[in-house]
Amino acid sequence: WNSQTSNTLFLSDGDATFLTLDLTLDALALGETWAVQGSFGGAWSTTSADQDSLDDLGRADTSPTWATINASIYGSVYLDPLVDPAWGKGNELYKPLVHEIFGSIRGQYAFDYRLTPMAQYVMGGLYTVRGFPQSVNAGDSAIVGTIEYRLHLPRSFSAAPPSKFPWLDKPFRWLPDSTSGAGPDWDFIVSGFFDGGSIGNSDNFAFEVDTGMLSAGVGLDLTLGTAFSIGVDWGWALNSVPELEVDAGNMQFWLSASFVY
Protein backbone atom coordinates (compact mmCIF):
# COMPACT_ATOMS: atom_id res chain seq x y z
CA TRP A 1 0.00 0.00 0.00
CA ASN A 2 1.05 3.59 -0.68
CA SER A 3 0.83 6.75 1.43
CA GLN A 4 1.19 10.24 -0.02
CA THR A 5 0.94 13.71 1.52
CA SER A 6 1.33 17.28 0.32
CA ASN A 7 2.21 19.94 2.90
CA THR A 8 1.66 23.42 1.47
CA LEU A 9 2.86 25.11 4.67
CA PHE A 10 6.32 23.53 4.68
CA LEU A 11 6.42 22.96 0.90
CA SER A 12 7.10 19.24 1.28
CA ASP A 13 5.61 16.12 -0.28
CA GLY A 14 5.63 12.67 1.28
CA ASP A 15 5.48 9.42 -0.68
CA ALA A 16 6.22 5.93 0.65
CA THR A 17 5.15 2.41 -0.24
CA PHE A 18 4.67 -0.16 2.53
CA LEU A 19 4.36 -3.93 2.68
CA THR A 20 2.09 -5.32 5.40
CA LEU A 21 1.55 -8.93 6.44
CA ASP A 22 -1.26 -9.59 8.90
CA LEU A 23 -3.14 -12.47 10.46
CA THR A 24 -6.41 -12.20 12.39
CA LEU A 25 -8.41 -14.85 14.23
CA ASP A 26 -12.15 -14.32 14.77
CA ALA A 27 -14.53 -16.16 17.10
CA LEU A 28 -18.27 -15.98 17.71
CA ALA A 29 -20.45 -17.61 20.37
CA LEU A 30 -24.25 -17.31 20.54
CA GLY A 31 -26.82 -18.23 23.17
CA GLU A 32 -30.54 -17.66 23.49
CA THR A 33 -30.06 -14.42 25.42
CA TRP A 34 -26.39 -13.57 24.87
CA ALA A 35 -23.68 -13.21 22.23
CA VAL A 36 -19.90 -12.76 22.32
CA GLN A 37 -17.64 -11.93 19.38
CA GLY A 38 -13.89 -11.41 19.47
CA SER A 39 -10.85 -11.01 17.28
CA PHE A 40 -7.10 -11.16 17.84
CA GLY A 41 -4.46 -10.38 15.26
CA GLY A 42 -1.00 -9.17 14.51
CA ALA A 43 0.56 -7.21 11.68
CA TRP A 44 4.11 -6.61 10.46
CA SER A 45 4.91 -3.72 8.14
CA THR A 46 8.05 -2.44 6.44
CA THR A 47 9.15 0.09 3.83
CA SER A 48 12.29 0.86 1.85
CA ALA A 49 11.65 4.62 2.04
CA ASP A 50 14.33 6.73 3.72
CA GLN A 51 13.74 8.63 6.97
CA ASP A 52 13.22 11.99 5.27
CA SER A 53 10.47 10.51 3.10
CA LEU A 54 8.82 8.99 6.16
CA ASP A 55 9.01 12.27 8.07
CA ASP A 56 7.34 14.05 5.14
CA LEU A 57 4.27 11.87 5.63
CA GLY A 58 3.44 14.00 8.66
CA ARG A 59 5.21 12.50 11.68
CA ALA A 60 8.85 12.67 12.72
CA ASP A 61 11.13 9.72 13.49
CA THR A 62 8.66 7.00 12.53
CA SER A 63 9.89 3.42 12.35
CA PRO A 64 10.58 1.99 8.87
CA THR A 65 9.64 -1.46 10.18
CA TRP A 66 7.10 -2.14 12.91
CA ALA A 67 4.72 -4.70 14.38
CA THR A 68 1.37 -4.28 16.09
CA ILE A 69 -1.14 -6.42 17.95
CA ASN A 70 -4.85 -5.65 17.57
CA ALA A 71 -7.67 -7.19 19.56
CA SER A 72 -11.36 -6.65 20.25
CA ILE A 73 -14.19 -8.29 22.12
CA TYR A 74 -17.88 -7.42 21.90
CA GLY A 75 -20.63 -8.90 24.02
CA SER A 76 -24.29 -8.44 24.85
CA VAL A 77 -26.66 -10.08 27.29
CA TYR A 78 -30.40 -9.64 27.77
CA LEU A 79 -31.66 -9.21 31.32
CA ASP A 80 -35.27 -10.27 30.69
CA PRO A 81 -34.93 -13.75 32.25
CA LEU A 82 -33.66 -12.01 35.41
CA VAL A 83 -36.26 -9.23 35.64
CA ASP A 84 -39.24 -11.40 34.62
CA PRO A 85 -39.52 -14.69 36.56
CA ALA A 86 -42.16 -15.91 34.07
CA TRP A 87 -39.94 -15.35 31.02
CA GLY A 88 -39.95 -18.38 28.71
CA LYS A 89 -42.11 -20.49 31.03
CA GLY A 90 -45.52 -19.95 29.41
CA ASN A 91 -47.08 -21.36 26.26
CA GLU A 92 -46.51 -18.23 24.18
CA LEU A 93 -44.08 -18.55 21.28
CA TYR A 94 -42.74 -15.00 21.67
CA LYS A 95 -40.00 -14.48 24.26
CA PRO A 96 -39.38 -10.74 24.61
CA LEU A 97 -35.77 -9.53 24.64
CA VAL A 98 -36.15 -5.92 25.76
CA HIS A 99 -33.41 -5.05 28.24
CA GLU A 100 -29.89 -5.39 26.81
CA ILE A 101 -26.46 -4.74 28.28
CA PHE A 102 -23.78 -4.27 25.61
CA GLY A 103 -20.05 -3.98 26.21
CA SER A 104 -16.88 -3.85 24.16
CA ILE A 105 -13.12 -3.53 24.58
CA ARG A 106 -10.75 -3.02 21.64
CA GLY A 107 -7.33 -1.63 21.06
CA GLN A 108 -3.87 -1.74 19.56
CA TYR A 109 -0.40 -2.35 20.99
CA ALA A 110 2.62 -1.06 19.04
CA PHE A 111 5.44 -2.18 21.36
CA ASP A 112 7.98 0.71 21.20
CA TYR A 113 7.51 1.49 17.50
CA ARG A 114 6.59 4.93 16.22
CA LEU A 115 3.96 4.32 13.56
CA THR A 116 3.41 6.19 10.32
CA PRO A 117 0.22 8.33 10.56
CA MET A 118 -1.88 5.90 8.48
CA ALA A 119 -1.15 3.11 11.00
CA GLN A 120 -1.87 5.13 14.16
CA TYR A 121 -4.95 4.54 16.31
CA VAL A 122 -7.34 7.51 16.42
CA MET A 123 -9.63 8.22 19.35
CA GLY A 124 -12.49 10.56 20.10
CA GLY A 125 -15.99 10.88 18.75
CA LEU A 126 -18.41 8.41 17.22
CA TYR A 127 -17.48 4.72 17.69
CA THR A 128 -14.83 5.50 20.36
CA VAL A 129 -15.35 8.10 23.15
CA ARG A 130 -18.46 10.00 22.14
CA GLY A 131 -18.09 12.94 24.52
CA PHE A 132 -14.92 14.10 22.73
CA PRO A 133 -14.48 15.65 19.26
CA GLN A 134 -14.06 13.23 16.37
CA SER A 135 -10.50 11.85 16.03
CA VAL A 136 -9.23 14.45 18.50
CA ASN A 137 -6.04 12.49 19.15
CA ALA A 138 -3.92 9.77 17.58
CA GLY A 139 -1.27 7.47 18.99
CA ASP A 140 0.64 4.24 18.64
CA SER A 141 -0.98 2.15 21.38
CA ALA A 142 -4.55 2.49 22.61
CA ILE A 143 -7.39 0.80 24.44
CA VAL A 144 -11.03 1.88 24.41
CA GLY A 145 -14.14 0.40 25.98
CA THR A 146 -17.89 0.92 26.10
CA ILE A 147 -20.67 -0.20 28.42
CA GLU A 148 -24.21 0.52 27.28
CA TYR A 149 -27.77 -0.19 28.38
CA ARG A 150 -30.30 -0.54 25.54
CA LEU A 151 -34.08 -0.56 25.88
CA HIS A 152 -35.76 -2.12 22.80
CA LEU A 153 -39.25 -0.58 23.01
CA PRO A 154 -41.12 -2.42 20.19
CA ARG A 155 -40.15 -5.78 21.66
CA SER A 156 -42.11 -4.94 24.82
CA PHE A 157 -45.45 -4.74 22.95
CA SER A 158 -48.02 -7.54 23.07
CA ALA A 159 -47.72 -10.13 20.30
CA ALA A 160 -50.16 -10.13 17.36
CA PRO A 161 -50.41 -11.56 13.80
CA PRO A 162 -48.32 -9.70 11.16
CA SER A 163 -49.88 -6.76 9.32
CA LYS A 164 -48.59 -4.83 6.28
CA PHE A 165 -46.23 -1.95 5.62
CA PRO A 166 -48.08 1.21 4.41
CA TRP A 167 -48.23 1.58 0.60
CA LEU A 168 -46.54 -1.79 0.12
CA ASP A 169 -48.27 -5.12 -0.36
CA LYS A 170 -45.78 -6.82 1.91
CA PRO A 171 -46.16 -8.38 5.37
CA PHE A 172 -44.52 -6.35 8.13
CA ARG A 173 -44.36 -7.13 11.82
CA TRP A 174 -45.16 -3.89 13.65
CA LEU A 175 -45.70 -5.99 16.78
CA PRO A 176 -44.09 -9.23 17.93
CA ASP A 177 -45.46 -12.15 15.88
CA SER A 178 -47.86 -14.32 17.87
CA THR A 179 -47.92 -17.00 15.14
CA SER A 180 -44.16 -17.62 14.87
CA GLY A 181 -42.63 -16.02 17.96
CA ALA A 182 -40.50 -13.66 15.85
CA GLY A 183 -39.76 -10.14 17.00
CA PRO A 184 -40.89 -6.94 15.27
CA ASP A 185 -39.41 -5.97 11.89
CA TRP A 186 -38.43 -2.60 13.33
CA ASP A 187 -36.75 -1.36 16.47
CA PHE A 188 -36.56 1.83 18.49
CA ILE A 189 -33.76 1.79 21.05
CA VAL A 190 -33.27 4.16 23.97
CA SER A 191 -29.77 3.84 25.39
CA GLY A 192 -27.43 5.18 28.03
CA PHE A 193 -23.68 4.70 27.66
CA PHE A 194 -20.28 5.16 29.25
CA ASP A 195 -17.14 5.28 27.09
CA GLY A 196 -13.52 5.31 28.23
CA GLY A 197 -10.17 5.08 26.55
CA SER A 198 -6.45 5.74 26.77
CA ILE A 199 -4.05 6.46 23.93
CA GLY A 200 -0.26 6.81 24.02
CA ASN A 201 2.77 7.46 21.84
CA SER A 202 6.12 5.69 21.70
CA ASP A 203 9.13 7.93 22.40
CA ASN A 204 6.76 10.86 22.24
CA PHE A 205 7.73 14.46 21.60
CA ALA A 206 6.55 17.20 23.95
CA PHE A 207 3.63 18.08 21.67
CA GLU A 208 2.40 14.48 21.45
CA VAL A 209 -0.15 14.05 24.22
CA ASP A 210 -0.82 10.74 25.95
CA THR A 211 -4.51 11.01 26.69
CA GLY A 212 -7.14 9.41 28.88
CA MET A 213 -10.76 10.06 27.90
CA LEU A 214 -14.02 9.41 29.76
CA SER A 215 -17.52 10.27 28.60
CA ALA A 216 -21.17 9.43 29.22
CA GLY A 217 -24.33 10.04 27.27
CA VAL A 218 -27.65 8.91 25.87
CA GLY A 219 -28.81 7.79 22.45
CA LEU A 220 -31.81 7.00 20.25
CA ASP A 221 -31.78 4.54 17.34
CA LEU A 222 -34.49 3.66 14.82
CA THR A 223 -34.28 0.74 12.37
CA LEU A 224 -36.81 -0.39 9.76
CA GLY A 225 -36.17 -3.92 8.57
CA THR A 226 -32.63 -4.35 7.28
CA ALA A 227 -32.77 -1.41 4.85
CA PHE A 228 -32.88 1.77 6.94
CA SER A 229 -31.41 2.94 10.21
CA ILE A 230 -30.84 6.31 11.85
CA GLY A 231 -29.33 7.10 15.22
CA VAL A 232 -28.41 10.05 17.39
CA ASP A 233 -25.98 10.10 20.31
CA TRP A 234 -25.46 12.92 22.80
CA GLY A 235 -22.27 12.58 24.81
CA TRP A 236 -20.41 14.77 27.26
CA ALA A 237 -16.79 14.65 28.41
CA LEU A 238 -16.22 13.62 32.03
CA ASN A 239 -12.59 14.78 32.20
CA SER A 240 -10.59 17.73 30.93
CA VAL A 241 -7.65 17.50 28.51
CA PRO A 242 -6.22 21.05 28.27
CA GLU A 243 -3.70 20.08 25.57
CA LEU A 244 -6.61 19.13 23.29
CA GLU A 245 -8.77 22.10 24.38
CA VAL A 246 -11.39 19.80 25.90
CA ASP A 247 -13.05 20.66 29.22
CA ALA A 248 -15.14 18.38 31.42
CA GLY A 249 -18.77 18.94 30.50
CA ASN A 250 -18.11 19.68 26.83
CA MET A 251 -20.83 18.07 24.72
CA GLN A 252 -20.91 16.37 21.33
CA PHE A 253 -23.97 15.48 19.24
CA TRP A 254 -23.70 12.71 16.66
CA LEU A 255 -26.08 11.74 13.85
CA SER A 256 -25.61 8.62 11.73
CA ALA A 257 -27.86 7.04 9.10
CA SER A 258 -27.72 4.26 6.53
CA PHE A 259 -29.95 3.08 3.69
CA VAL A 260 -29.46 -0.19 1.82
CA TYR A 261 -31.25 -0.64 -1.50
Where are the regions that the model predicts?
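C-terminal outer-membrane beta-barrel translocator/porin domains of Gram-negative envelope proteins
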Residues: 2-185, 196, 200-202
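C-terminal structured "cap/appendage" subdomains that terminate the fold
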Residues: 199, 209-232
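Short glycine-rich, acidic/polar surface loops and turns
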Residues: 175-179, 205, 215-221
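Hydrophobic, well-ordered secondary-structure elements that form the walls
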Residues: 73, 147, 195, 220, ...
